[in-house]
């Protein structure tokens, strides 16, 4: 590709050649050079977060940086960003605005602007960024590179200047999926000293082609983006089965990010630094200062609305494996951003802001180029823990060799009550790496009883020879759970419920929730409803 030659303002600080030579380039990533977004600590250099008043060198490197170093990669320096990682444009920095490597008239995207640029120009092989609202994907799209935004908590954020700490993710930029994935593999790992670090089992990758969700309504893209998007849908049809779905709840969720709890969280993180100093970007000050006046009532209203939208989105993943979306609706010029800095930025987050709120993982990859020569980026999204599936899908999209992912043994578990999709304990299943297989029914001999307790649940018992033996059986969902996670899951099941053999209507047998005899109370028999959802609907 032809890259612009104008000054990119991509670097804030660099290590000297002597400093770089001091690292032992031994390990799986030996020979790779990497850059670090300047809100992530690299020992010996200041972490400015885009604020030149922050001049103290970091005494140690962030966990993510150190993991790359330990794997043999060599750090080169720190990259420019929208100040305090607040922005998707790449222009809100006293160190200068970054441009797309394809056009010095168009913005680079942010907030991880410099990281995407130095990968695109070939100055480094890999760069670290962060992604709260899309900062690891928008710059990837605007510079024609790959951007991995992992499941929240898979990569430690210890040593990262917080923007919105409960949502922040460390991300990876590279020119191809395989290199990005190699860095990702080195970065992932539980950190007991990071309160937001999580242990999440990797969901198994199906051998069949993926079912790819595509929005069933127009997305209000600019005309050149629209052409590239239609070409992207055609390419998706070559990868797997395309299914058109309603994404309105996802897009509504995106609008929540700069409201309520999450704007207040930004104010909590660095609002005290946004004084009248000329070093502070005025747009960043204007946006974040609004969080100062939000109340606890505003916060809980936001949490409640997010919970409602999360429930609305959950059934989507029963229909598809991954969701395909554009990364942005347009690619603005510097002049457009200057004329409307907040409105333009808001538009850029339309398809990315919801990702961390809904606990999704994502990967941005180059799509068909626009007719004017600018890049067009698409993203694949999936529920938490499905990072391997996204890597495999992204590699196929880019025409690369298959990404090597660990194939996990798994077991199918039938659930009938509180672990059903949308029910209170479903998150426990998903958090252990389970993926929905489908809905079916038990053999007709099963009866369903109401089990009391703080959380009412159904208990299934097989009673051969009863009147129910000619019925349709009880509705259950089948979930595929990594075998390694089965023991921990079974340990959460308290009497009178247990995990045991469960016969299905088709004659097959799986593990499932059953109840012991002391729960079989004829007065609490709710078999006639045919399933837990129908019972709840009758209440």
Regions found by a protein language model. Give the residues of each.
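Short glycine/serine-rich loop segments
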Residues: 61-62, 66-187, 356-379
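Short Gly/aromatic-enriched secondary-structure transition segments
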Residues: 14, 48-52, 425-442
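A short helix-breaking turn/cap at a secondary-structure junction
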Residues: 149-230, 392-407
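Short helix-loop capping/hinge segments that flank enzyme active sites or metal/cofactor-binding pockets
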Residues: 29-49, 209, 261-310, 314, ...
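Short, well-ordered alpha-helical
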Residues: 1-57, 62, 84-87, 229, ...
């Amino acid at each position: 590709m032809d890259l612009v030659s104008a000054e990119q303002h991509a670097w804030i600080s660099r290590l000297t050649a002597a400093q770089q030579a001091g690292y032992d380039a031994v390990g799986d990533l030996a020979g790779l050079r990497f850059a670090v977004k300047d809100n992530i600590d690299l020992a010996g250099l200041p972490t400015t977060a885009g604020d030149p008043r922050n001049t103290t060198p970091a005494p140690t490197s962030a966990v993510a940086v150190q993991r790359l170093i330990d794997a043999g990669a060599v750090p080169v320096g720190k990259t420019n960003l929208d100040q305090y990682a607040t922005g998707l444009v790449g222009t809100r920095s006293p160190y200068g605005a970054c441009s797309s490597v394809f056009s010095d008239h168009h913005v680079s995207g942010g907030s991880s602007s410099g990281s995407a640029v130095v990968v695109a120009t070939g100055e480094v092989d890999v760069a670290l960024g962060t992604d709260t609202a899309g900062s690891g994907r928008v710059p990837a799209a605007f510079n024609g590179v790959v951007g991995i935004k992992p499941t929240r908590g898979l990569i430690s954020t210890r040593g990262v200047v917080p923007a919105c700490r409960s949502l922040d993710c460390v991300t990876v930029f590279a020119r191809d999926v395989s290199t990005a994935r190699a860095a990702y593999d080195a970065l992932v790992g539980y950190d007991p000293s990071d309160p937001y670090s999580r242990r999440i089992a990797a969901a198994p990758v199906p051998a069949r082609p993926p079912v790819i969700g595509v929005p069933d309504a127009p997305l209000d893209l600019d005309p050149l983006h629209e052409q590239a998007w239609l070409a992207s849908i055609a390419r998706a049809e070559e990868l797997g089965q395309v299914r058109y779905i309603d994404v309105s709840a996802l897009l509504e969720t995106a609008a929540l990010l700069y409201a309520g709890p999450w704007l207040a969280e930004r104010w909590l993180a660095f609002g005290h630094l946004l004084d009248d100093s000329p070093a502070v970007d005025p747009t960043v000050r204007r946006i974040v200062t609004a969080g100062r006046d939000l109340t606890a009532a505003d916060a809980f209203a936001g949490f409640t609305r997010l919970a409602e939208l999360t429930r609305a989105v959950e059934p989507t993943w029963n229909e598809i494996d991954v969701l395909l979306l554009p990364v942005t609706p347009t690619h603005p010029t510097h002049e457009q951003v200057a004329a409307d800095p907040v409105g333009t930025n808001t538009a850029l987050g339309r398809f990315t802001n919801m990702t961390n709120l809904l606990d999704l993982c994502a990967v941005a990859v180059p799509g068909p180029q626009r007719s004017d020569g600018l890049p067009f980026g698409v993203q694949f999204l999936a529920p938490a823990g499905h990072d391997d599936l996204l890597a495999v899908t992204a590699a196929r999209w880019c025409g690369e060799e298959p990404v090597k992912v660990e194939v996990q043994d798994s077991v199918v578990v039938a659930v009938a009550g509180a672990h059903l999709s949308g029910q209170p304990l479903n998150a426990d299943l998903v958090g252990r790496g389970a993926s929905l297989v489908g809905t079916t029914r038990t053999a007709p001999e099963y009866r369903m009883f109401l089990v009391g307790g703080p959380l009412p649940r159904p208990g299934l018992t097989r009673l051969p020879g009863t009147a129910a033996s000619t019925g349709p059986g009880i509705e259950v969902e089948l979930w595929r759970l990594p075998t390694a996670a089965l023991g921990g899951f079974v340990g959460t099941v308290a009497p009178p419920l247990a995990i045991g053999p469960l016969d299905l209507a088709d004659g097959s047998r799986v593990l499932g929730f059953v109840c012991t005899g002391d729960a079989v109370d004829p007065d609490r028999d709710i078999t006639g409803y045919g399933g837990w959802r129908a019972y709840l609907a009758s209440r």
